Amino acid sequence: MQKKSIYVAYTGGTIGMQRSEQGYIPVSGHLQRQLALMPEFHRPEMPDFTIHEYTPLMDSSDMTPEDWQHIAEDIKAHYDDYDGFVILHGTDTMAYTASALSFMLENLGKPVIVTGSQIPLAELRSDGQINLLNALYVAANYPINEVTLFFNNRLYRGNRTTKAHADGFDAFASPNLPPLLEAGIHIRRLNTPPAPHGEGELIVHPITPQPIGVVTIYPGISADVVRNFLRQPVKALILRSYGVGNAPQNKAFLQELQEASDRGIVVVNLTQCMSGKVNMGGYATGNALAHAGVIGGADMTVEATLTKLHYLLSQELDTETIRKAMSQNLRGELTPDD
């Protein structure tokens, strides 16, 4: 039986960094040298893999929509030559990149796993070894044909993840959807609902930078704060509200949202809570937002909502189509109402 072959896109991040007097820094070729010294990556059970190092290597804090586009085009260029793809990435914006790729890559017929580490691969107690080893093995032997994120022995749907711990190995959470797979003594696929999946050739949708605001509601927030966020050229606003989607019933505040909606700005309501979903019909305060033209974001993460808006705004769709699509389950990013 022919061995599977996995393409590794090494964008940067902690996993390949080297210690210096200024702290950890990315060094070209360092990751590859470390992997050559680790025999477990070259056991016969492991797939073949090719590492493509990006130039320059990036700290994920510098990641932009142009970089998401570059990664997606890289996957497209090598799509027919490999059985799966692993993206090595810094943890700070990993959930954003995984979410963005999920929307950009339509009709995905091969696994794309995003992973990295909290401690560099070359350092004692690095989590990079087990994360990368498992990502390669799972991509080859337990393929799930969507964009996923592997960290600390769990494989998550990428657009359901958020970074939940700044310095722990259990760095990522999927608050509203169980993992797709767990890698313990045995590797187990879980009965997690599948994402919607189309048929046909892989389509890579473009993403371009879009002016999107994010506002967290807090006690005493003024209409002026919201007004400043809604100034041109903003095309969309994510409103992080209380509980199931509640916000102050301040008339000036609601008027700003109504006027923004009338101007064609897409306003999406997300809960500040770690888990659960928005239901703007549950309380009068949430209902007032709906009457002001605000769309409910269901149980999407901020990362999924932001990248979904980037994706839709990049397609030159009219405002009403974008509003409808924000409430639709395109890539498994939200839980539809029963």
From Swiss-Prot:
One of its GO terms (molecular function) is asparaginase activity. It comes from Escherichia coli (strain K12). Its EC number is 3.5.1.1. The keyword Hydrolase applies. Shows cooperative activation. Allosterically activated by asparagine. The keyword Cytoplasm applies. It is an enzyme of class 3 (hydrolase). InterPro entries: AsnA_fam, Asp/glu_Ase-like_sf, Asparaginase/glutaminase-like, Asparaginase/glutaminase_AS1, Asparaginase/glutaminase_AS2, Asparaginase_C, L-asparaginase_C, L-asparaginase_I. The active site is at residue 14. It comes from the Bacteria. Homotetramer. One of its GO terms (cellular component) is cytoplasm. E.coli contains two L-asparaginase isoenzymes: L-asparaginase I, a low-affinity enzyme located in the cytoplasm, and L-asparaginase II, a high-affinity secreted enzyme. This is L-asparaginase 1.
